[in-house]
């Protein structure tokens, strides 16, 4: 999805992508008088070639060609008798070195491939946080650092036991991790520079955390860990440094110029989904999506079976709200008709907030895979500090070998030329916010209110206070301390818990993991659900939007809570399971349904 069509970019990559026919319903009068084909006619001819007959009806319409959407597009088109359309707001990533070269991920922040959503003012946090959201095929897996961790068993069992998701325990979900197509490996030894190696040893020495060579394998075989330090598992090719994103792994092989192209896959690139379309005879049934190309021309893409929303934790609730699905009072306040009152749409917004501790260094360390190749995991508060006690770590550190100084400079700190940053990260933030609409205009960016550090008991702030203290202890260890010149931020003058907490909140940032805004659960009155939980948007049994037919959600928005560590693999695993649920629903007693709805 895209917040606004970009007139500088084409609707399609004619080699690697496909698009809707881009011509008006009523041709311009000059078109018939020209001696040769007009530009619009040539474009229409190209579109007709790519989509025979100007096809706008498919079995499945997927909104969002990102992390989850790529998985679903691949798995559903394995049935050659099924046609699948993917609506993607950005361009193809094929041949784009800025996207495919993992080392260049920082170049994409704030670029034309970034939706760059601001946050609303945060009374207790940093009001200047920009949430980077990818505008490119592959979504955030084409935009992030590809740090790849399976969820801890306890993360998934928490959904089952405490969030009315009995269909999603670890025993059910973990096997889907074995199906992932991405190449996930620890950072290659030859790409581990001495600074990162020394930091890993210093972290272990200061905290007692064991050094694990393959953190992900430890999760797979033991279900998780409480503390550990080591180099990350990353989805990449260690020889070329190229991404193994969801797009590269799931879409590139089956696209028109891929080695296993599938003619039943139709990519609509640089195409914006405006609203859902309802059956004229059944207001509870979704039958398609209204879309707009960058030229402002509109089409309706119809789904014979289902529409599947994979636009992410920001744009999936945004599309639902613009389609009249959400809290009645919020919609009517903007002049939007409420077609289905689903109060939970946009609620439960959560994230992995982080702060920063920065030291000046003498020079920039040798380049690594993506400047943040190792991590530390600790338990710093007692388990009863959380509403649902969790045995895993509650604090995570990244080490960045570049100066992340925007937020510190804003509050008066110097910007060093060379720096190392440790970023304490809250594994299970207790703050919950909201995504809402700024106006009834689909082109306007939504309002993101994460309510950073507004959780009761100041749990999130307490985690960061402990994180700053541990960072300083690590910096005292040899040989790592030989790389450091001086502490820049928060600086030696900041010592009390009160001062550390205030600093940590003011310069806090995000690791870009918004989730939970269309959370799954058990709707009241069905599947044995008790009571009424209005925060549930998606039925955990099948990922269908509560009270509607023909529309499902599969992306980070359905997660009741974030997993302890980076959520990308969790989202991929949810998508693998969703594909299986969707395919199974299309068959009865070994026969394909003739009337899907």
Model-derived regions: residue spans:
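Conserved redox-cofactor binding core of oxidoreductases
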Residues: 145, 160-279, 285-286, 356-360, ...
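N-terminal glycine-rich phosphate/pyrophosphate-binding loop and immediately adjacent elements
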Residues: 36-175, 337-345, 351-361, 371-375, ...
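Mid-to-C-terminal "cap/lid" subdomains and adjacent gly/pro-rich loops that border
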Residues: 260-264, 317, 321, 325-428, ...
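Active-site beta-strand/loop architecture of penicillin-binding DD-peptidases
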Residues: 404-462, 524-527, 531-565
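Extreme N-terminal leader/targeting segments of oxidoreductases
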Residues: 2-59, 584-597
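Glycine-rich loop(s) and the adjacent beta-strand/alpha-helix scaffold that form part
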Residues: 79-85, 90-95, 100, 169, ...
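A glycine-rich dinucleotide-binding beta-alpha-beta segment and adjacent secondary-structure elements
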Residues: 268-269, 274-277, 479-562, 569, ...
């Amino acid at each position: 999805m895209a917040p606004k069509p970009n007139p500088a970019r084409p609707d399609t990559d004619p080699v690697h992508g496909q698009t809707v026919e881009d011509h008006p319903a009523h041709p311009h009068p000059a078109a018939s008088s020209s001696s040769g084909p007009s530009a619009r006619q040539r474009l229409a001819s190209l579109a007709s070639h790519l989509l025979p007959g100007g096809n706008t009806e498919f079995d499945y319409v997927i909104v969002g060609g990102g992390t989850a959407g790529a998985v679903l597009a691949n798995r559903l088109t394995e049935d050659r008798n099924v046609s699948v359309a993917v609506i993607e707001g950005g361009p193809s990533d094929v041949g784009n070195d800025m996207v495919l070269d993992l080392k260049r991920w920082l170049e994409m922040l704030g670029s034309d491939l970034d939706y760059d959503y601001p946050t609303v003012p945060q009374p207790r946090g940093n009001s200047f946080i920009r949430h980077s959201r990818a505008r490119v095929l592959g979504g955030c897996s084409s935009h992030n650092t590809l740090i790849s961790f399976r969820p801890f068993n306890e993360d998934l069992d928490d959904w089952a036991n405490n969030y009315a998701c009995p269909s999603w325990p670890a025993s059910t979900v973990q096997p889907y991790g074995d199906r992932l197509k991405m190449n996930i490996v620890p950072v290659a030894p030859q790409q581990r520079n001495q600074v990162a190696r020394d930091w890993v040893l210093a972290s272990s020495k200061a905290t007692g955390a064991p050094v694990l060579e393959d953190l992900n394998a430890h999760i797979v075989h033991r279900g998780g860990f409480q503390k550990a330090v080591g180099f990350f598992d990353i989805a990449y090719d260690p020889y070329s440094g190229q991404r193994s994103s969801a797009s590269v792994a799931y879409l590139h092989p089956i696209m028109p110029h891929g080695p296993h192209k599938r003619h039943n896959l139709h990519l609509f690139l640089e195409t914006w989904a405006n609203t859902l379309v309802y059956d004229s005879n059944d207001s509870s049934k979704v039958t398609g999506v209204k879309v707009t190309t960058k030229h402002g021309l509109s089409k309706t893409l119809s789904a014979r079976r289902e529409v599947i929303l994979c636009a992410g934790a920001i744009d999936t609730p945004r599309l639902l709200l613009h389609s009249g699905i959400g809290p009645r009072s919020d919609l009517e306040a903007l002049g939007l008709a409420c077609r289905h009152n689903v109060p939970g749409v946009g609620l439960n917004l959560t994230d992995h907030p982080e702060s920063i501790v920065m030291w000046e260094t003498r020079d920039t360390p040798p380049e690594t895979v993506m400047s943040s190749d190792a991590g530390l995991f600790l338990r710093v508060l007692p388990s009863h500090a959380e509403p649902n006690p969790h045995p895993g770590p509650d604090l995570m550190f990244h080490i960045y070998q570049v100066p992340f100084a925007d937020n510190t400079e804003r509050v008066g700190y110097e910007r060093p030329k060379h720096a190392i940053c440790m970023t304490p990260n809250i594994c299970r933030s207790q703050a919950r916010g909201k995504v809402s609409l700024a106006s009834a205009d689909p082109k306007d960016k939504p309002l993101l209110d994460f309510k950073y550090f507004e959780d009761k008991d100041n749990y999130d702030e307490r985690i960061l206070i402990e994180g700053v203290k541990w960072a300083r202890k690590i910096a005292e260890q040899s040989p790592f301390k030989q790389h450091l010149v001086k502490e820049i931020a928060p600086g030696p003058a900041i010592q009390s818990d009160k001062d550390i907490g205030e600093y940590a909140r003011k310069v806090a940032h995000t690791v870009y993991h918004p989730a939970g805004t269309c959370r799954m659960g058990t709707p009241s009155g069905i599947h044995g659900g008790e009571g009424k939980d209005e925060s549930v948007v998606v039925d955990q049994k099948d990922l269908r939007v509560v009270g509607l037919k023909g529309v499902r959600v599969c992306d980070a928005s359905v997660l009741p809570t974030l997993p302890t560590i980076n959520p990308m693999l969790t989202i991929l695993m949810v998508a693998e399971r969703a594909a299986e649920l969707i395919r199974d629903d299309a068959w009865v007693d070994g026969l394909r349904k003739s009337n899907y709805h």
